[in-house]
């Protein structure tokens, strides 16, 4: 009996020892499945990677939704601005036809439209385009050598928007850029042989002050300085002795109305006043 028992005990002892060593390198699961440490590490890493991917996907979706929402808001704002533009355009045209004060006639909504136009850079783009259009026209014709071919430039631009502190930096920058562009236009036309005539709304009593101001801004060698828009006699005298090739003005009343220039071409420059809404077009 002991002879048979001894080998059997050795076998059971070997099985027990082998089982203990295998359990040392495996994780036991109640279902009876076993997982090595390497497989467990891979499984955990996969879960972490999947979680990171899901978070990244959620962030991407959130960003896309926010972008779409912002785009929709921008479209709605543009539509509202277009509607406001049409509304202000009618009121502005009515004010000009009846020689009314636009500052008192137009609502603050129109003021906001004009301010947005300046802030978004539309004003300067339109100004530069108009100046280039004028230069292109004057380059197609050649003034005669008798110094009788003149170009009239309106040098006034009454700024009704300076009170708004929020837009002040945009307005000041627009004014600065405009002064540079207009002076360049003036110098270019003068170099082509045109006699330059400057037009101001200021009263005759401010002529000397106006001359000094023009010189300080870089203007020189003009042939005439017409003062006071209420007195058209200076304009009539100019037309009797000169050929007005073109008139470049900031305001409609300078180009039409009582002035009624006998000019070959009129150019309306965008200005920094309420009547700009006539030229406003959201792009």
Swiss-Prot record:
Annotated spans, Disordered: 1-21
Designated name of the protein: Uncharacterized protein At2g39920
Assigned protein family: Belongs to the APS1/VSP family.
Keyword annotations: Membrane, Transmembrane, Transmembrane helix
One GO term describing the cellular component: membrane
Membrane topology annotation: Single-pass membrane protein
Main location: membrane
Record-linked Pfam families: Acid_phosphat_B (PF03767)
Keyword Transmembrane attached: yes
Superkingdom to which the source organism belongs: Eukaryota
Localization annotation: Membrane
Keyword Transmembrane recorded: yes
Annotated organism of origin: Arabidopsis thaliana (Mouse-ear cress)
Transmembrane segments: 41-61
């Amino acid at each position: 009996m002991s002879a048979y028992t001894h080998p059997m005990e050795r076998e059971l002892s070997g099985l027990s020892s082998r089982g203990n060593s295998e359990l040392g390198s495996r994780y036991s699961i109640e279902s009876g499945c076993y997982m090595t440490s390497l497989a467990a590490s891979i499984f955990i890493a996969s879960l972490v990677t999947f979680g990171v991917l899901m978070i990244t996907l959620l962030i991407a979706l959130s960003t896309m939704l926010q972008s779409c929402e912002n785009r929709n808001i921008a479209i709605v704002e543009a539509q509202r601005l277009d509607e406001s533009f049409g509304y202000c355009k009618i009121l502005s045209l009515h004010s000009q036809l009846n020689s009314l004060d636009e500052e008192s006639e137009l609502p603050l909504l129109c003021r906001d439209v004009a301010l947005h136009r300046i802030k978004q850079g539309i004003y300067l783009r339109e100004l530069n385009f108009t100046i280039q259009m004028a230069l292109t026209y004057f380059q197609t014709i050649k003034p005669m050598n008798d110094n009788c071919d003149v170009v009239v430039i309106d040098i006034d631009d009454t700024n009704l928007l300076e009170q708004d502190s929020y837009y002040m930096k945009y307005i000041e920058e627009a004014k600065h850029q405009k002064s540079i562009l207009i002076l360049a236009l003036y110098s270019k036309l003068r170099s082509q042989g045109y006699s330059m005539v400057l037009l101001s709304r200021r009263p005759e009593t401010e002529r000397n002050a106006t001359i000094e101001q023009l010189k300080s801004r870089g203007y020189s060698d003009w042939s005439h300085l017409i003062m006071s828009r209420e007195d058209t006699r200076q304009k009539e005298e100019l037309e009797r002795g000169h050929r007005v090739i073109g008139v470049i003005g900031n305001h409609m009343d300078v180009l039409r109305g009582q002035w009624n220039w006998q000019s070959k071409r009129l150019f309306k420059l965008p200005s920094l006043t309420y009547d700009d809404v006539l030229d406003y077009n959201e792009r």
